[in-house]
Design a protein with these regions (language model features):
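Short, small/polar residue-rich loop motifs at catalytic or cofactor-binding pockets
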Residues: 230-231, 306-309, 368-370
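Extended C-terminal subregions enriched in glycine
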Residues: 284-291, 364, 396, 403-446
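Internal maturation/activation junctions in enzymes
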Residues: 259-327, 338-339, 439
Length: 476
């Protein structure tokens, strides 16, 4: 069997290569690549990430979605209720919060367990062998982590004693410093023996809760044990000559892709203003807590009736396709001594918590812009997705718009992009001419504009990464 991979994580390709002699399928490659990314892509993701999965099952010829995004604890009864706010120059200016009290319940291991039980063909010990090895022997930083750590290493990852010790080699040399996560290696061995559910019910869960409690966090054992995925809250939209499958809520990411597509394909000179209005509509109307799923579904029906993240996509020749985007926020800086797992800071992402820090979100699914999708047309089936915070939707929509015109994924990914911010300011890559707009132009292939990855099966397997995010792709 042949398998293809496209990713924004440099080490994911090495993970795929590590099992290539075992005749892996698309699920096998996705599992080992995702775990490896959570080890190596420090700050970009972490071993306490959450994700959204969209996939196509080649046996049943059906598409599905799984929402395993962060959920707030049922109560905020931990000792630390202070907002430990920090400021970083990453992406211009970012305010976020650090500490164990920003930790939300992650769902990535529910996805990995589901994939392993239903689609994997290789024993779990083999799938986790490479991430166990690299976490124990050590690794140098990939470029996206270097770019992030230039801004975040001191304020976010050096305040915590254990984290500061583990990352000590990076203090003076981001390029050559080696990170070793021996405790995380032990935890991965535990996963290989007991399965991913140990994160929610077993010894790993107990170790996490001990650290959370000792450091003032709010997540409890009950919060871990009662975490549930949301299956098949999806839409299936015919748009021009494409069929697009994605999440219909409570995540708002796919809704925003469709709305960006709608504006980008209008024949108007007022496109920039319409994109500014769309950005503000998202902030003002879509980012709320409550029944977002029903709201998002209604918004998608209206479209149908009117004309810090990682992404990994995998496909195989048995027509299985997996599109996974996952995140840990900006990272909390907390490194759990017993498990070697860095904690997420999803309760502390200020821009995604409009109710305020530790506001009325108890037990709620948090807000996500992620949008892993499946696209089908007469020529084949494809996975698409991107990291990039609030640029995820605009990046994917521009690539889809390009593909509708040129039917070439490589050209569609490589064409210059632009993004309209909340205040109407436009940022664009060189080579793009925006008439009557004062835009700030960046260099070609700027990582600001996401990293759209595509895999698929036409006459043969296909994979293409994005030069904005390391251009990682692989076919065995």
């Amino acid at each position: 069997m042949k398998v293809s991979l496209a990713s924004t994580s440099e080490y994911s390709k090495k993970a795929a290569e590590s099992i290539s002699d075992l005749s892996p399928n698309a699920a096998d490659v996705l599992i080992t690549s995702a775990i490896t990314s959570m080890v190596t892509d420090l700050g970009v993701v972490a071993p306490t990430s959450s994700g959204l999965l969209t996939y196509y099952d080649g046996v049943s010829n059906s598409s599905h979605t799984i929402d395993a995004y962060f959920v707030a604890p049922k109560n905020f009864n931990g000792e630390d209720k202070e907002q430990h706010k920090i400021t970083m120059t990453y992406g211009g200016h970012v305010e976020t919060c650090k500490g164990a009290n920003t930790f939300a319940v992650p769902g990535i291991y529910k996805i990995l367990q589901f994939l392993y039980e239903n689609f994997a063909s290789i024993p779990l010990k083999n799938l986790i062998e490479y991430p166990i090895m690299i976490s124990n022997e050590g690794f140098k930083l990939a470029q996206p982590t270097k770019d992030y750590f230039k801004h975040s290493l001191e304020p976010m990852f050096m305040w915590h004693d254990y984290s500061s010790k583990v990352l000590s080699e990076l203090k003076n040399n981001l390029d050559e410093g080696v990170v070793r996560l021996e405790k995380l290696s032990d935890t991965l061995i535990q996963f290989s023996n007991e399965g991913f559910q140990d994160f929610y019910y077993g010894d790993i869960a107990n170790s996490l809760i001990e650290t959370i409690k000792n450091e003032g966090g709010h997540v409890t054992k009950d919060d871990l044990e009662t975490y549930k995925m949301i299956k098949d809250s999806k839409f299936n939209l015919n748009y021009k000559d494409l069929n697009i499958i994605g999440h219909a809520g409570p995540s708002i990411g796919s809704l925003m892709v469709l709305k960006y597509l709608e504006v980008l394909n209008l024949n108007t000179d007022n496109k920039v203003k319409l994109l500014e209005n769309l950005y503000n509509a998202r902030k003002n109307n879509y980012e709320f807590f409550g029944d977002r799923a029903e709201f998002v579904k209604k918004e998608i029906k209206n479209i149908i009736s009117s004309p810090s993240t990682i992404h990994i996509g995998t496909s195989d020749t048995k027509n299985n396709h997996f599109s996974l985007t996952f995140s840990s926020g900006y990272g909390s800086g907390v490194l759990c001594k017993n498990t070697g797992m860095y904690f997420n800071n999803s309760l502390g992402e200020i821009e995604l918590n409009p109710q305020g820090f530790l506001g009325d979100t108890k037990g709620e699914r948090l807000i996500s812009n992620m949008s892993p999708i499946i696209v089908t047309n007469k020529s084949g089936i494809f996975t698409l997705g991107s990291p990039g915070a609030d640029r995820i939707s605009s990046a994917i929509a521009q690539v889809l718009t390009n593909y509708i015109s040129n039917k070439n994924w490589i050209q569609s990914i490589n064409m210059p992009r632009y993004h309209v911010n909340q205040d109407g300011n436009v940022r664009a890559e060189l080579g793009l001419q925006l008439s009557s707009v004062n835009a700030t132009y960046t260099e070609e292939f700027d990582m600001y504009f996401g990293g759209v990855c595509v895999t698929g099966l036409e006459d043969d397997l296909f994979a293409q990464g994005d030069p904005r995010r390391s251009n990682v792709y692989w076919i065995n």
